[in-house]
């Protein structure tokens, strides 16, 4: 039977750093206001790179680190809520740019749970025995979706991308999974489009910007998501580290208490990147491999958990 493993990781973020103090010059906010409520101190903002550019950078890094040629890839999956355009998909753009001529490619839209959903999907593709190698990338340019006069959202989000190379393995590396959706609730919405045709009445004026009910998302995370993670941990055992979606430092603090796990096991980097939605978990994973907190091939276990708009939430326990 075929299994899947994470064999390489990579991340990329735009060079432009925007601090809380920078934001205080263009809107009614302050470093103290942002940091005390979110833990965020700065974020990266793209000047001219689009989502596919960030994702392609990560793809090239993964190929270089692995020594693979793009022709050896079987698939490219990209999790994003900020694509370059509705079609072609970001994944198709990446596939075409890197020359992965033998790979199929598609995007997954599950907001801040997107990378977890994409990784779970990719693991099943390899486990089927039909595919051996593929890229799973989370990439966002959320800055283009924001109303920069709305401090409730504009201070939270940033741009970036991260990803993994998933390959066939003789040993099991994915030990626990919980994927969930509650479409009766929203919490986070972005990029609404009007219904326009010669037959529509033309009265609809949807908001094109990112909108979020912060309190609802916070309550959802610390209640529903923490309960889901706790159940998975009780069933599969406590992992070495928890890599949760990087939305808010207070969410991590509260969830550690709810799950009854040492806060030291919860890795964090939203201080430097803000909320990068589907990119946050792979960026966090790649950074912690780079600083050697995590080591590929060490048999460390990690819990990856995303949660956000949809509502969606999902967790995986993975041996790296």
From Swiss-Prot:
Active site (UniProt): 112, 245, 275
Catalytic activity: malonyl-[ACP] + acetyl-CoA + H(+) = 3-oxobutanoyl-[ACP] + CO2 + CoA
Keywords, sorted A to Z: Acyltransferase, Cytoplasm, Fatty acid biosynthesis, Fatty acid metabolism, Lipid biosynthesis, Lipid metabolism, Multifunctional enzyme, Transferase
GO cellular component: cytoplasm
Keyword Hydrolase: no
EC category name: transferase
Gene3D superfamilies: 3.40.47.10
GO biological process: fatty acid biosynthetic process
SUPFAM superfamilies: Thiolase-like
Subcellular location: Cytoplasm
GO function terms (MF aspect): 3-oxoacyl-[acyl-carrier-protein] synthase activity; beta-ketoacyl-acyl-carrier-protein synthase III activity
Pathway as given in its UniProt record: Lipid metabolism; fatty acid biosynthesis
Entry EC no(s): 2.3.1.180
Keyword Transmembrane attributed: no
Region annotation ACP-binding: where it falls in the sequence: 246-250
Superkingdom of the organism of origin: Bacteria
Pfam families: ACP_syn_III, ACP_syn_III_C
HAMAP family: FabH (MF_01815)
Description of its domains: The last Arg residue of the ACP-binding site is essential for the weak association between ACP/AcpP and FabH.
Assembly and oligomerization: Homodimer.
Stored NCBIfam families: fabH, PRK09352.1
Similarity annotation: Belongs to the thiolase-like superfamily. FabH family.
Function, as annotated: Catalyzes the condensation reaction of fatty acid synthesis by the addition to an acyl acceptor of two carbons from malonyl-ACP. Catalyzes the first condensation reaction which initiates fatty acid synthesis and may therefore play a role in governing the total rate of fatty acid production. Possesses both acetoacetyl-ACP synthase and acetyl transacylase activities. Its substrate specificity determines the biosynthesis of branched-chain and/or straight-chain of fatty acids.
Protein name, entry field: Beta-ketoacyl-[acyl-carrier-protein] synthase III
Species in which this protein is naturally found: Streptococcus thermophilus (strain ATCC BAA-250 / LMG 18311)
């Amino acid at each position: 039977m075929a299994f899947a493993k994470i064999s390489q990781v990579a991340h990329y973020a735009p060079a432009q750093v925007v601090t809380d103090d920078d934001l205080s010059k263009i809107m009614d906010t302050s470093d103290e206001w942002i940091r005390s409520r979110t833990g965020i101190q700065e974020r990266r903002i793209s000047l001219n790179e689009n989502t596919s550019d960030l994702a392609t950078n990560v793809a090239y890094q993964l190929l270089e680190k692995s020594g693979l040629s793009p022709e050896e890839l079987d698939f490219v999956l990209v999790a994003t809520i900020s694509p370059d355009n509705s079609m072609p998909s970001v994944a198709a753009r990446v596939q075409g740019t890197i020359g992965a001529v033998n790979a199929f490619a598609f995007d997954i839209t599950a907001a801040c749970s997107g990378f977890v959903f994409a990784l779970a999907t990719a693991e099943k593709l390899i486990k089927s025995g039909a595919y051996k190698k593929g890229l799973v990338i989370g990439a966002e340019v959320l800055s283009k979706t924001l109303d920069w006069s709305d401090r409730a959202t504009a201070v939270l989000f940033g741009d970036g991308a991260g990803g993994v190379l998933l390959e066939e393995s003789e040993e099991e590396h994915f030990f626990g999974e919980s994927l969930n959706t509650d479409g009766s609730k929203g919490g986070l919405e972005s990029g609404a489009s009007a219904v326009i045709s010669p037959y529509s009445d033309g009265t609809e004026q949807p908001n094109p910007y990112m909108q979020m009910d912060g309190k609802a998302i916070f309550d959802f995370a610390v209640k529903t998501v923490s309960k889901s993670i706790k159940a998975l941990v009780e069933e599969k055992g406590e992992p070495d580290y928890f890599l949760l979606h990087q939305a808010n430092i207070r969410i991590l603090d509260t969830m550690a208490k709810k799950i009854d796990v040492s806060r030291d096991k919860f890795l964090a980097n939203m201080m430097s990147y803000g909320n990068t939605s589907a990119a946050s978990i792979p960026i966090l994973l790649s950074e912690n491999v780079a600083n050697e907190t995590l080591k590929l091939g060490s048999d460390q276990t990690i819990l990856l958990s995303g949660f956000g708009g949809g509502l969606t939430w999902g967790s995986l326990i993975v041996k790296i």
